[in-house]
Amino acid sequence: MQASAAFPKAARLLKTDEFSSVFRLRPWRRTAHFVIYGKPTGRDARLGLVIGKKYAARAVTRNLVKRLAREAFRTRRAEFAGWDILLRLHTRFDKKAMPSAASAPLAALCAGEIRELLDRAAREVARRNGAKPASE
């Protein structure tokens, strides 16, 4: 049971070449703050995160976004088998509405947008794989 709760290094995009190969493709979907890309690999699902200082100046905010994204992906990793998924922050958060990373609205906003993007990405993966159900 503990193995299914892990998020090992093998489930992450780590090298510049791995990120570049996914970035070369057109983005699948966008939300107000995030963009998601995907690339078929035929191997286990892997996640890459690009959360730059330009859009989230404080480290605590970047870490919150990464933590939420990793957890959302980890729980749905089987749906993305054979694909590299890259999630990129592309817009700043409104500092007046969300003054700190500890603010509940920021966590709720990020979690909601990430969940929405992963839902869309899962449908896209299923469509491109020939509409195979995730349970197979």
Swiss-Prot record:
Q: Which family does it belong to?
A: Belongs to the RnpA family.
Name the InterPro entries for this protein.
Ribosomal_Su5_D2-typ_SF, Ribsml_uS5_D2-typ_fold_subgr, RNase_P, RNase_P_CS
Q: What is this protein called?
A: Ribonuclease P protein component
Species source reads Burkholderia mallei (strain ATCC 23344)
Q: Which HAMAP family match?
A: RNase_P
A Gene Ontology biological process noted in the UniProt record is: tRNA 5'-leader removal
- Recorded E.C. number(s)? 3.1.26.5
Q: Which Pfam families match?
A: Ribonuclease_P
TM segments? none
Q: Which domain of life is it from?
A: Bacteria
Q: Name one GO cellular component term.
A: ribonuclease P complex
| PROSITE patterns for the chain | RIBONUCLEASE_P
